[in-house]
From Swiss-Prot:
It is found in: Cytoplasm. InterPro entries: PPIase_dom_sf (IPR046357), PPIase_FKBP_dom (IPR001179), Trig_fac (IPR005215), Trigger_fac_C (IPR008880), Trigger_fac_C_sf (IPR037041), Trigger_fac_ribosome-bd_bac (IPR008881), Trigger_fac_ribosome-bd_sf (IPR036611), Trigger_fact/SurA_dom_sf (IPR027304). It is an enzyme of class 5 (isomerase). It comes from Agathobacter rectalis (strain ATCC 33656 / DSM 3377 / JCM 17463 / KCTC 5835 / VPI 0990). GO terms for biological process: 'de novo' cotranslational protein folding; cell division; chaperone-mediated protein folding; protein transport; protein unfolding. This is Trigger factor. The gene is tig. The keyword Cell division applies.
Amino acid sequence: MSVQVENLEHNMAKLTIEVAAEELEKALDSAYQKQKKQISVPGFRKGKVPRAMIEKMYGAGVFYEDAANILMQQTYAGAVDESGVDIVSRPTVEVTQIEKGQPFIYTAEVAVRPEVTLGKYMGVTVTKIDTSVSDEEVDAELENQRNKNARTVTVTDRPVAEGDTAVIDFEGFVDGVAFEGGKGENHPLEIGSHTFIDTFEDQLVGKNTGDEVEVNVTFPEKYQAEDLAGKPATFKVKINEIKAKELPELDDEFAQDAAGVDTLAEYKEEIKKNLTEKKETEAKKTKEDEAIQKIIDKSKMDLPEAMIETQCETMVEEFAQRIAQSGLTMEQYLQFSGMTVDQLKDQVRPEATTRIQSSLVLEQIAKEENIEVTDADIDAEVEKMAKAYGMEADKLKEYMGDAEKESMKKDIAITKAVDLIMDNVKERAKAKKKADAEESTEE
């Protein structure tokens, strides 16, 4: 295998990867072995048709696509190592030559880690944040806990109201025809959650158990299912049950049940302590974000588009994993929200860009400050992770590959860089706009 590197504009590069003809022949045979059981030829049993016969009937390129995929999977990682390019995106690949008896050649366009020229990062000024907790905040959290500890009861003496959960059967129609994904039975729908499109939920308010109603809505103009986008729809809905929350009394008994303390007064003190800790944690993160953003604003880097696109895709994948834990597929989420995958990627793009910029400047600070990650640092992080997973640290370390260890090492270095920045920040009370502008020009 040989690899040639061509540097392109805006921190992009093109790798041209050439694989020996012998390796292509092996991949073609692997593709044949994979596909032969699905190919039928008169006079031969399935799986027994000679490769030459299949190529004669369907053309010499019948196995090219599978063979190309096999070879790219086998060779890409090695080609990246051989190139020495610090790649920070998924590749855009193109096969430029595939022919029996000839070398297999393909290209991969990739983003290259951009160089970072740091601005001022020591002595950055951040806004001081008040972390005190008021009595009103304690009361609001108490009310929140009452809602969490509420019983769900079936309501029979009144119609659907805001905040209720209506258990419904529904079926949707466009132009009188039922559409795919528009039917459900005994679906619990919280009124006011805006889970369903348009004014669907509003039209159930005031209806009683057993009512069969027609709900008229319009799908958003930009909707995942293009055949439904912008169209009016009618849903036939039956209300099977109305459920409401019954809140517990705010007394010592509630405090005992909710928090295991003796009195409501003790519970309030515990809530105040927890809220204070939460505020302090949030304040720390907010000040870190402010400091890092100021460093980003004063630094220079040219982010390749492919790097941002890869980060957007990663964040959408992470989101899909999170909603899957609640039993919702990405397809269902997109249908309910009226969004497309591209719109979701556009939505996360600003955060994706900030994540990349933060990572790049912090890695550069770690490099310029000669921040070291010791074996003890790694052991401590493994210990923390093992505790979170309920595993033995040694076992977890055995499962970790080189890539995971390298990623952990990078994360620890970034954390140390953040600590260094925050150890040297200057705090100031929130200033007026004029003072803010003057302070900004100084940094």
